[in-house]
A protein has these predicted regions:
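N-terminal Rossmann-like FAD-binding beta1-loop-alpha1 element of flavoenzymes
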Residues: 8-32
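Glycine-rich active-site loop/strand segments that organize a redox cofactor
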Residues: 52-84
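Short beta-strand to alpha-helix junction loop
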Residues: 78-89, 123-141, 152, 205-213, ...
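An anion/pyrophosphate-binding glycine-rich loop and adjacent beta-alpha core
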Residues: 218, 224-341
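Residue-level detector of alpha-helix initiation sites
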Residues: 10, 14-15, 37, 197-199, ...
Length: 343
């Protein structure tokens, strides 16, 4: 059994995995494994944007940290929150200036910022309603130019073992759509597990097909401590389509731009549960409020309504969502759209 040697093995090719490869020393020999093709990942499905303090005249690190701790019910790792908040603005500018990400801009050329749940200030940098795809595709272009990085598509890491300071990987490669896969073997000094979420363990999910929690199992088998598995996020506004397992996400940014949540009677209800934050409470809170309202009304019917806004604004700000729900028979410039919480 021959093992091909690399310095670093990165499992997963979403934004986390690719950004890691781009920021490692160029002298390192890097192998990246993608379960399917590079753009089939949760990162490419992300719509809303990137939270960072880009407008220091109206925002601050302390406010962002406070919002994050409140949304995390103070269970956050404060050191990690500080790193995220304080390094965030520079990384957003790096995405824009170094990697070519085209964030939406204001008339003065600065990055346009929107509002999302749990945030007390506008701090979400975005590219219309397909921010993840914009970032992912630009990072892919960059990593494909690196001579020290090898990317293998259609590859599944079956087993990962460690002997002293070396990791050994058994990788199933080949056509995942019916071809003849083969086992290939690699070893590396370091491993980065960037395998994404666990959405596919649920009947209905907005996650990509590759999100099956592989990284958790791989890390556990190596002896890593696994924490907080009960903290699974359910997004309150997926398009309500119980005929399809793959649910389409309606970005939180739609509520950030003023959309209302309505119950089965087409009435707003968030004021009963969150009188201050209303529709812009954190996702887990909004989802819980919807469950309480379902108990109160006896109906699982919910709607999201932004139709009172200017139609041209809606079509320009949310072109992907607008066209997607139009295919489903709803014109969000004229009527509410059906939604329900989903992983």
């Amino acid at each position: 059994m021959k093992f091909k040697k690399f310095d670093v093995l990165i499992v997963g090719t979403g934004i986390s995995g690719i950004y890691s490869a781009l920021n490692l020393d160029s002298s390192l020999k890097i192998l990246m494994l993608s379960k399917r093709e590079l753009t089939l990942c949760n990162s490419a499905l992300a719509q809303g944007g990137v939270a960072a303090v880009m407008d220091k005249e109206h925002d601050s690190y302390d406010l962002h940290i406070k919002d994050t701790l409140i949304a995390g019910q103070y269970k956050n790792n404060l050191d990690n929150v500080r790193i995220l908040v304080e390094q965030g603005p520079a990384e957003v500018l790096k995405l824009q200036e170094k990697y070519g990400v085209e964030f939406d801009l204001k008339d003065d050329g600065s990055i346009a910022l929107t509002l999302e749940g749990g945030h007390s200030r506008r701090r979400i940098a975005h590219h219309k309603d397909s921010t993840g795809f914009e970032i992912e595709t630009n990072l892919i272009k960059q990593v494909q130019e690196l001579k020290n990085v090898t990317v293998i598509n259609n590859s599944v890491l079956c087993r990962l073992e460690r002997d002293n300071r070396v990791f050994f990987a058994d990788v199933l490669t080949g056509n995942c759509e019916g071809g003849t896969p083969e086992h290939e073997y690699y070893c590396a000094d370091s491993v980065i597990l960037a395998t994404g979420g666990i959405g596919r363990v649920y009947d209905f999910t907005t996650n990509s097909a590759i999100a099956t929690g592989d990284g958790i199992q791989l890390a556990y088998n190596l002896g890593a401590e696994i924490k907080n598995l009960s903290y699974v996020q359910f997004h309150p506004t997926a398009f309500a389509d119980k005929e399809n397992r793959e649910c389409f996400l309606i970005s939180e940014a739609v509520r950030g731009e003023g959309a209302y949540l309505l119950n089965c009677h087409k009435q707003r209800f968030m004021h009963k549960y969150e009188p201050e934050r209303l529709e812009l409470a954190p996702r887990d809170v909004v989802s819980k409020c919807m469950m309480e309202e379902q108990k109160a009304t006896g109906s699982d019917e919910f709607w999201l309504d932004i139709s009172y806004k200017d139609p041209e604004f809606i079509r320009n700000r949310f072109p992907m969502i607008y066209n997607k729900v139009l295919e489903k028979g709803y014109d969000m410039t004229k009527e509410p759209i059906p939604i329900y919480p989903c992983q």
